[in-house]
């Protein structure tokens, strides 16, 4: 079962809470209700959806919900675990040969690791392995970019549709200039679509696109670590060398902690 990335919903709730707090603290509950206007919301959401339909094929749009859900899930692979796996595999490969690693495949969940090890067992040349695995990385990156682009475009479109809604409201307001008492309320309603467009863009669409970009970056980084581990296995590098080489990819803070622990053990 995938864990929930709590920072995403918490961040959205914090943003909404600050807006609600600012409105209520300035004018009370009645002022807050003035910020709720269903037609304005429909103009922005409907307009964004319409432009997304024009911009992307149906097959891609169907996946928008699934792609967006990734921003609310936490499934980051631990780099330290990957390093530990390849240290263990390199020890076994040096003792028993590369063919012995076939028995370890059932215990490995990551399909990318499995694919790399199978290529190594089959005796594929290191450069060919690197080329094949990097081609897969490029495919993953392109697929993620396509999914993320829907949220990036929605973030661009939302403020524009907010402005369109405001223009519609202003036209309607100007047509009722003969009733000055309604100008203030009509102007407020006209501006609400701009408010909704800016809010959706800066609190939902763009942040989700940024979160997805960060997750993609981490996934590609882990796959690069795996490639180096597979090449090390094929080259018959000893476990200490593999560990030292792959540790370079670990976060700086964790590397420093490991170095301190090693110094303590040596002392």
From Swiss-Prot:
Q: How does it sit in the membrane?
A: Multi-pass membrane protein
**Which sequence ranges are listed under topological domain Cytoplasmic?**
209-267
Disulphide bonds annotated for this chain are none
Chief place where the protein resides = membrane
The source's domain of life comes to: Bacteria
Gene Ontology terms, cellular component aspect? Answer: plasma membrane
* Locations listed in the record: Cell membrane
Set out the biological process GO terms recorded for this chain's protein.
bacterial-type flagellum-dependent swarming motility; chemotaxis
UniProtKB keywords: Cell membrane, Membrane, Transmembrane, Transmembrane helix, Transport
Pfam families tied to this protein: MotA_ExbB
Q: Any transmembrane segments, and where?
A: 4-24, 32-52, 154-174, 188-208
The role this protein plays is:
May be involved in some transport function.
* Stated family: Belongs to the MotA family.
> This protein is called what?
Uncharacterized 29.3 kDa protein in ccpA 3'region
């Amino acid at each position: 079962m995938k864990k929930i990335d709590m920072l995403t919903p918490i961040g959205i709730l914090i943003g909404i809470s600050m807006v609600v707090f600012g409105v209520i603290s300035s004018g009370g509950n009645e002022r807050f209700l003035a910020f709720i206007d269903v037609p304005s919301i429909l103009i922005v959401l409907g307009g964004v959806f319409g432009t997304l339909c024009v911009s992307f094929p149906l097959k891609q749009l169907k996946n928008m919900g699934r792609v967006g859900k990734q921003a609310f899930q936490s499934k980051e692979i631990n780099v330290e675990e990957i390093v530990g796996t390849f240290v263990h595999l390199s020890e076994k490969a040096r003792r028993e040969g590369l063919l012995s690693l076939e028995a370890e495949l059932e215990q490995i969940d990551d399909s990318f690791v499995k694919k790399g090890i199978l290529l190594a067992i089959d005796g594929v040349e290191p450069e060919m392995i690197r080329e094949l695995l990097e081609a897969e990385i490029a495919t993953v990156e392109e697929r993620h970019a396509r999914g993320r682009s829907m949220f990036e475009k929605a973030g661009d479109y939302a403020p524009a549709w907010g402005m369109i809604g405001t223009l519609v409201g202003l036209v309607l307001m100007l047509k009722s200039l003969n009733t000055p008492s309604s100008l203030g309320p009509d102007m407020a309603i006209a501006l609400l679509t701009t408010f909704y467009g800016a809010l959706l863009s800066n609190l939902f669409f763009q942040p989700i696109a940024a979160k997805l970009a960060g997750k993609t970056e981490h996934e590609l980084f882990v796959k690069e670590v795996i490639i180096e581990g597979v090449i090390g296995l094929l080259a018959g590098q000893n476990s200490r060398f593999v560990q030292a080489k792959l540790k370079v990819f670990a976060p700086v803070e964790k590397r420093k902690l490991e170095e301190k622990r090693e110094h303590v053990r040596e002392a």
